[in-house]
From Swiss-Prot:
Single-stranded telomeric DNA-binding protein that is required to protect the 3'-end telomeric overhang. It binds the consensus sequence 5'-GGTTAC-3'. Regulates telomerase and telomere length. InterPro entries: NA-bd_OB-fold (IPR012340), POT1 (IPR028389), POT1PC (IPR032042), Telomer_end-bd_POT1/Cdc13 (IPR011564). The keyword Amino-acid biosynthesis does not apply. Gene3D superfamilies: Nucleic acid-binding proteins (2.40.50.140). GO terms for molecular function: G-rich strand telomeric DNA binding; single-stranded telomeric DNA binding; telomerase inhibitor activity. This is Protection of telomeres protein 1. The gene is pot1. SUPFAM superfamilies: Nucleic acid-binding proteins. Belongs to the telombin family. Its main location: nucleus. The keyword Transmembrane helix does not apply. The lineage of its organism: Eukaryota, Fungi, Dikarya, Ascomycota, Taphrinomycotina.
Length: 555
């Protein structure tokens, strides 16, 4: 960077080169940092703070102090949240004191590493920094007094660069504040000058699982968590894979449409950041190259993960309500409203009937215990089965169950049958000896329960003890006690809790409401018992399905 004053265009040329110099230091642009193939590279960075968390002390490990910043520069899309960087220090008083988003920040000696398929930055022990105020602010009070140990000495070149970065940042944010929306009738072009080809758009009624699709839609409902942003969108076309919204199942905030017209979209990373700041209910959006999949309840949903390398050119953008591409959506919306006014009672009656025929084994939601770790007291053999959810199993088509299916679930035990351990072994047929036979009601993170049967050799494999054998347990209290101690490893004090509720004349299912039993992986075989020569697939019903445990051992 020379002595002459440069403008925004020249700054963009410097950044687009990927690597550039200011004074004696060489810097890496944010986008090139995110795309570096060689990880654990030490770089210097210069950008705008797009988000941050104040410094705090870690409660575990070395108990270092840490602050997290998201650094942005013009090589990133406007909607991108930038590069995540964790700054660590043994002392809490020598980390940057950031007051607000928009401040220019220079970081010296940052290590880039790969984490969960994305790049993030970590500070080295000797890292240093320089921080400027938000120059677009009327007051320079946006710069707090900074701690001296890591503060870099900078000159006019660095301040000029910071000023230009802040100017471009201010221009980009003002575009959204003033409602200057991107015209979607032309190809999109980002700040780096890369233009993308036109995209093929679909109606929501045409999308299917496991594809990438693009569509226009109206935002019906939004909410967010610490991790992501969720919205429901519709183009007023119907898809049989969508969740059937009705006045009985949707929240009071749901204003329609009712039926299978709306799809849930979960947004992460830069898409999350963009929607939190610029999208509200009622807005029209264009979503490009989003991924579709079946959720844990068996319904279609859309996912937008971070895509800093632009491999898929995924995006969500607000669209001006006067765009001609929205005319058909508005027309279908008017027709939907008119039809509802003419026959809403019939629609509600139809939907309520469909809700009454829901799967009988899907339980009411209980207060979920967070999964901190999987117990070491359970192993599975073989270890090749793919992890799935109970809801996915319950919503699988019956006609595909001509052969048994095997699943791996991550669950906790919330109930069992019989209620007395003395009945866990029964006489075999013909009555010559005893065999194990009992069932565990398990629940996974989707808050759905499944009854899993353990019989004979599969149950013996679960118990996994030569000292505990099936017998008339009522006549062998010592054997029953050993069985109780063995099962304690997978269900904790659940048996005592259930017996406590039974002794008080209460329902034993109350024990499952705040259960804190261990989490573990269980193998389940799903099948329909063959009775006679049944080949009529149409006669199969959900209540014929069975689930048996296998390949699971307590150790």
């Amino acid at each position: 960077m020379g002595e002459d004053v440069i403008d925004s265009l020249q700054l963009n040329e410097l950044l687009n080169a990927g690597e550039y110099k200011i004074g004696e230091l060489t810097f890496q642009s944010i986008r090139s940092s995110q795309e570096l193939q060689k990880k654990n590279t030490i770089v210097n960075l210069f950008g705008i703070v797009k988000d941050f968390t104040p410094s705090r002390q870690s409660l575990h490990g070395t108990k270092d102090w840490v602050t997290t910043v998201y650094l942005w520069d013009p090589t990133c899309d406007t909607s991108s949240i930038g590069l995540q960087i964790h700054l660590f220090s043994k002392q809490g008083n020598d980390l940057p004191v950031i007051k607000q988003v928009g401040q220019p920040l220079l970081l010296h000696q940052i290590t880039l590493r790969s984490y969960r398929d994305r790049t993030q930055g970590l500070s080295k022990d000797q890292f240093r920094y320089a921080l400027w105020p938000d120059f677009s602010s009327n007051s320079k009070d946006t710069l707090c007094p900074q701690p001296m140990p890591r503060l870099m000495k900078t000159g006019d070149k660095e301040e000029q660069f910071a000023l230009l970065l802040n100017k471009i940042w201010d221009e980009q944010t003002n575009k959204h504040k003033n409602g200057e929306l991107l015209s979607t009738s032309s190809a999109r072009q980002n700040q780096t000058g890369l233009s993308y080809p036109s995209v093929s758009f679909s109606l929501l009624s045409q999308i299917t699982p496991h594809q990438r699709c693009s569509f226009y839609a109206q935002v019906i409902k939004t909410w967010y968590s610490d991790k992501n942003f969720t919205l429901y969108v519709t183009d007023y076309t119907e898809n049989e894979l969508f969740f059937p919204m009705s006045p009985y199942t949707s929240s009071s905030r749901w204003r329609g449409p009712f039926g299978r017209f709306s799809i849930r979209c979960i947004l992460w990373d830069e898409h999350d950041f963009y929607c939190r700041n610029y999208i509200k209910e009622g807005d029209y959006v264009v979503m490009k190259n989003v991924r579709t999949k079946i959720d844990h309840l068996g319904y279609l949903e859309c996912i937008l993960h971070g895509d800093s390398a632009k491999r898929y050119n995924m995006s969500i953008e607000k669209v001006d309500s006067e765009e001609p591409e929205l005319n058909e959506i508005k027309s279908r919306k008017r027709l939907y409203v008119q039809n509802c006014q003419n026959g809403i009672e019939a629609v509600i009656e139809k939907l309520s009937q469909s809700q009454q025929s829901e799967n009988p084994f899907i339980a009411h939601e209980l207060k979920q215990t967070s999964v901190n770790e999987i117990t070491a007291h359970v192993i599975n053999e073989p270890a090749s089965l793919k992890l799935t959810t109970i809801s996915t199993i319950l919503h699988a088509p019956l006609q595909n169950l001509l052969k048994p299916r095997k699943h791996r679930l991550r669950v906790q035990v919330v109930d069992f049958w019989p209620k007395s351990l003395t009945q866990f072994a029964v006489l075999s047929q013909p009555p010559s000896s005893y065999v194990w036979m009992f069932a565990l009601l398990v629940r996974d993170v989707s808050n759905v329960t499944l009854p899993v049967i353990f019989f004979d050799s599969d149950a013996a494999e679960l118990i996994n003890s030569s000292k505990i054998q099936p017998c008339n347990l009522a006549d062998h209290p010592q054997m029953t006690l050993q069985l109780k101690e063995r099962l304690f490893l997978i269900w904790g004090n659940l048996e005592e809790r259930i017996q406590h509720h039974i002794s008080k004349g209460e329902s034993p299912t109350l024990a499952a409401e705040d259960v804190e039993t261990p989490w573990f992986d269980i193998y389940v075989k799903e099948y329909i018992p063959v009775i006679g020569n049944t080949k009529d697939h149409q006669s199969l019903t959900f209540l014929q399905k069975r689930w048996r445990g296998f390949g699971t051992k307590i150790v």
